[in-house]
Amino acid sequence: CACLVGSEMCIRDRYGITLNKLEGIPTYHPDVEVFEVKDADGSQLGIFYVDYFPRSGKSGGAWMSNYREQQGATRPLVCNVCSFTKPVGDTPSLLTMDEVETLFHEFGHALHGLLTKCEYKGTSGTNVVRDFVELPSQINEHWATEPEVLKMYAKHYQTGEVIPDEIIEKILKQKTFNQGFMTTELLAAAILDMNLHMITDVKNLDMLAFEKEAMDKLGLIPEIAPRYRVTYFNHIIGGYAAGYYSYLWANVLDNDAFEAFKEHGIFDKNTADLFRHNVLEKGAVSYTHLRAHETCADL
């Protein structure tokens, strides 16, 4: 997958990390590929599994999982699962920009799991407070659409032509298009999540009526629905109970943190080391060492 190659090139240029594909490793399905992740000094950071394509019986969506978490000298086994269109014959898997950002997002979670250096697995990798867990993933999305990075991996699948500047310009413009709508639907889902976790009496509860009442109180117009409705809001039973707001809070953190890279260059080694040592390795405890200030939730 060219996009995975692009993502790998980004971490190689930032951290000196390499992914080496392993053959003959037992996996739970033939579609799963396995990579050994090595640091700049050649030491092993962990094993990375990718399961990118849909199949019968596989859940849809995208996520990162741990088969073994880092603890002391024990290195992690990390997996990214996605639902991208499978290659057919000589035609490779072609991704939309949304899917490319999903790949970079989940790879950011994987980096968090692979680069962690904690004494106890209960505090390693993604085992951090929900307010913080989406920072490593969402900041990694920024590299997906940086012009310098797009030219590394975004090439015509038949001719090999590098993506032209006029298309890059359109990609950058669409990143800010309709953001008011997207922020509103995310906020609506976050508030719905909070309201669900303040229910005290579940007897004869009509969930759809509950959702409508909650949204009516917000004054939400019918044309804008919560990003996730009560009938399929998987996050609230998948580790984000009363915590879906963390995606929006992570937007504050990741934009602030990425400014550090923009100030010095998106592949600046010193900035990358600061982010690695104070955010990815230690998990949520040293953010101010990266930016030297607290972030603010005020709009």
Cite the ranges covered by each PLM segment.
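A generic structural signal for short coil/turn motifs at secondary-structure boundaries
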Residues: 88-92, 123, 201
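Short alpha-helix carrying the canonical HExxH Zn2+-binding catalytic motif
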Residues: 96-104, 108
